[in-house]
Structures are given as structure tokens and as C-alpha cells.
Amino acid sequence: MIRITLTAGLMGWLVLLLAAPAHAQLDLFSKSQRIEFTPEWQGDRFPDGRPKVPDSVLARLKDVSADEAWDVLQDAGYRSQFEGGWKVINPGERLVGRVVTAVFMPKRPDLDSVIRQNGKKENRIGDENSWIIDILTPGDVLVVDLFGKIRYGTIVGDNLSTAIYAKSHNGLIVNGAVRDVTGIQKIPSFEVYTRGVDPSALENVMLTGINVPIRIGDATVMPGDIAIGDPEGLTFVPPQLAEKVADDTEMDHLVDEWGHMMLRQGKYTPGQIDSRWTKEMIEQFNAWLEGKGSKIRMPER
């Protein structure tokens, strides 16, 4: 008897393929599945089911560092949401955006033939690395798993980078490489996190999923997550935790600001500021928050 053992990853793909209709779309995850696999998100969604964290929350997350996001995620049990070790092109203000995922695998002719046939049925134009750009909307960050390939693993050059920025007004993350860096550097505010750069063109790969769960190094990434880039690396925040990350970080910053002000004014000692605050201190702090127009408050202890 011949026994065949399937890996968990292969089993997952087979389940999706067998559950899909006869003319399955390339993305493999349906709208209902994107909703099913993000059950804790109760807010708005894109037409394809991807969670849509509000722009107002995205703006607040631009002040968040990897360390600050890490604390909230760890407390919530999310221990695989950070990945470091990137080369950054056009570093500037922090990269923040709603994740659109894409996954590539080494090319296998029989599978790639089916993928291209399905692409034609879906009226997709150009090479497979351009298909993923067509679905981007303002505020999106394209996150591509290209299995760390550098030589012949260049997902974009300056032309497709221009197209990405025109659609999303945001950046790119690729566990692979890019080319035409001189041209990419001429695209203002287009921030790229990449594993490397190479002059070769993209070859011998195939696009096997759009807006499906992917792995970026040690991080598990879902469509609709919020990508936050800073000098330490990339943090992928589940949508249901995005506002809490923003709230907790804002509170930390405001506590520091008020504490420094109290020390400069001589109203409290360093020991008082660094220890458990009294009820009177909390009341004064909350009154100061109200005066600043902040909506968050410190609860009484």
C-alpha cells in the first residue's frame, strides 16, 4: 500500500480548491471566506469582504512605533505579527496602510497555464505581477510573498511602481526584490520595504493567490491587516486591534507629555510621576486631555 502524506499548507490549498466553483477566480478566497476568517472585525468592509479600517485610524497610526504596537499585540495573544531585516527605499514618514496580499510560488507549467487561462476569463491584462495592481485603492499597501527570491524575483521596476503609487498613494512590501531603484527613488513618497534589489527581470514564478492569508518571514498576514513600517521593521496589525493600538499609543504619548510638563512646572516630583498616580493626578490629567480635545481618558484606579 502506498501512503501519501499531505502537508498542512497543501491540505489548505486543496480544501479551498475543492470548495471553489468550477470557474474559480484566481484569489481562491471568496468574499464570504474573507468575512469568515476575520470574525472579530465589526466595521466596514470593501466589496470583496476585506476589512476597511477607517482613514481616521490610519492617520493616528502614523505615530506608532513597532515597540508600541508590539505591546498591544502581545497582550492580545498575537505573537507573530512583526518582521525585521528590510532594505527600505525612499524612507520617510511611517508607512501605514490597509494590506492587499499577493503570493507567488516557483513556476510549475501545468498550474501556471490554468492561472493564465483563468486570468483571461477574468479580463486580467498583462503579466501576473501587474494583475495585483489593478485592485488597489487609495490607502492600500501591497504586500507580496515572493518566497525571498532576489535574482529573477523583482516584483516591480519603476513603471509598475509608478502604477502602484498612482492607484494607492502608498507603498509596497515584498518578500523578494525590486529593480530600477534609481527610477523608484524618483517617485515621491513611494516607500518600499524589500529583501533586496537586482537588475534582473521577474522570471519563473506564478501568482497563486490575491487577498489570501500569506506568510512574510515570521509574520502571518491577512488582507485587511494594517501594515505599519518604522526603522525597526514591519508590524501587521489585525484590523480589530488597530484602534486599540492607536488609543494605547496616544495615551502613552500624552502621559509622557503631561508628566514632563508637570516636572518642568515643579508640581510633582519624578517619583510621583513614575509611580502609581493618585486620584487627584488622574483628574488633573483627564481635564488636561479634555482641554486638548482628546477623546481618550485615563480610568480611575
Regions found by a protein language model. Name each.
Residues 1-3:
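N-terminal hydrophobic targeting signals that begin at the initiator methionine
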Residues 20-24:
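Sec/Tat signal peptide C-region and signal peptidase I cleavage site
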Residues 49, 164, 225-227:
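Buried hydrophobic positions in well-ordered alpha/beta secondary-structure cores of metabolic enzymes
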Residues 50, 232-234:
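Structural motif
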